[in-house]
Amino acid sequence: GKISKKDKQLIGLACAHMTSCPYCIRSRTKLALAAGATAEEIAETVFIAMRLAIGQPYAYSSIALENFDKMKNKESVTEGSFFSKNITPQIKDFHEHSGTMFEKFSVFNEKVYEDGHLSKKLKKGLMGLACAILAKCAWCIRSCIRDGIQEGVIKEEITEAINIAMVMNAGACWAHAGITMEVVDQSLSKTK
């Protein structure tokens, strides 16, 4: 593949944080360390997941604000497509009403994505994209693709990052299957 083994493990670790799977987090942390990742790279990876976890509710605030305005004006809220629209007006409205919280978010956003132990290309274009897909945020996906192109990401790297996200999402289900089967066993033993 086009992405190094270490970077794949770091992308997987970011995705593990997005799925909130403690087993996946432990496993991917060990695999990332074994692939040569440093503690600093792992810490930056967690911050990328945190940033994208913020991204979905941030972008979706546009839906809430648009609906608020439409409902206050007694307009229909069932027409149009939220995912293809330009959310800039509602995001600006959100910024205006957020006070100093938006300034703090902006500082966090810039710090998370600046070059550090991990490259902007990995953080914005690949790790960010994988997390955005798991956050199911169309606008986050769009911005990660835009940023990734600016950082030189190629389509093969994007598809590898997406595949990592898919595997990690399924991995969270697999890792928690034991809980399900434990409940099944307990329930069946009570009925016998």
Q: Language-model features: where?
A:
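Hydrophobic alpha-helical segments
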Residues: 1-192
